[in-house]
């Protein structure tokens, strides 16, 4: 007897498959750390991680004091987070990163954050 999955289970399973596939290919090094983007329904978070040492080198999110208040829609907030994480990464001496979208599709808020980080000097 075959059990069919509901729509939300299929989406969750597809996200998990994408996440595993991306993480097999993407790893951060000290010279080129990983830019990880995590998204919830309300907030977006970005971290620059050196996987060898296991340390976060720079981070930004919509929960930061400088970004709190929610000016604009969620896509505009993602752009601000991308610009802020790029600024903090450059201050930490990081010019190039590898992008880890965390199993999310490259569209909407994920793409807005990535484009803003690229526009503010991060190379990926």
UniProtKB/Swiss-Prot annotation:
Listed GO biological process terms: translation
Pfam families membership: Ribosomal_L18p
Keyword Coiled coil: no
UniProt keyword annotations, A-Z: Ribonucleoprotein, Ribosomal protein, RNA-binding, rRNA-binding
GO terms under cellular component: cytosolic large ribosomal subunit
GO molecular function annotation: 5S rRNA binding; structural constituent of ribosome
Record-linked HAMAP family: Ribosomal_uL18_B (MF_01337_B)
Protein purpose: This is one of the proteins that bind and probably mediate the attachment of the 5S RNA into the large ribosomal subunit, where it forms part of the central protuberance.
NCBIfam families: L18_bact
Stored PANTHER family: 39S RIBOSOMAL PROTEIN L18, MITOCHONDRIAL, LARGE RIBOSOMAL SUBUNIT PROTEIN UL18M
Family per record: Belongs to the universal ribosomal protein uL18 family.
Assembly and oligomerization: Part of the 50S ribosomal subunit; part of the 5S rRNA/L5/L18/L25 subcomplex. Contacts the 5S and 23S rRNAs.
Record's protein name: Large ribosomal subunit protein uL18
Native source organism of the sequence: Frankia casuarinae (strain DSM 45818 / CECT 9043 / HFP020203 / CcI3)
